[in-house]
């Protein structure tokens, strides 16, 4: 796996509701990253996301949903930009 500079991988989230936030509740949601993945610079991976094998995440992308195998994603939020060859 390659990780570019200023890439953030988050695993903790908090409630949006103010009353719940005051209770200091936090939820840990693991991030899973497959093989042969390239996270370019300034990528943000949000809690609970699974990134498949042979994936490229373009510079500046914010990944809020799972990414399947053999895909390049880009944007905020990250969307499929291209299908990649398996090899």
What is each residue range found by the language model?
Residues 62-64, 72, 80:
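Conserved hydrophobic/aromatic beta-strand scaffold that supports enzyme active sites
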Residues 1-49, 76-77, 83-85:
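Flexible, glycine/small-residue-enriched loop-and-beta-strand segment within the central core
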Residues 40-56, 61-65:
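Beta-rich strand-turn-strand
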């Amino acid at each position: 796996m390659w990780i570019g500079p200023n890439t953030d991988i988050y695993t903790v989230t908090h409630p949006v509701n103010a009353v719940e936030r005051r209770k200091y509740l936090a939820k840990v949601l693991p991030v899973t990253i497959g093989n042969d993945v390239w996270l370019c610079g300034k990528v943000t991976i949000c809690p609970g996301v699974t990134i498949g094998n042979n994936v490229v995440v373009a510079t500046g992308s914010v990944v809020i949903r799972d990414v399947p195998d053999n895909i390049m994603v880009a944007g905020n939020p990250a969307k499929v930009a291209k299908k990649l060859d398996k090899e």
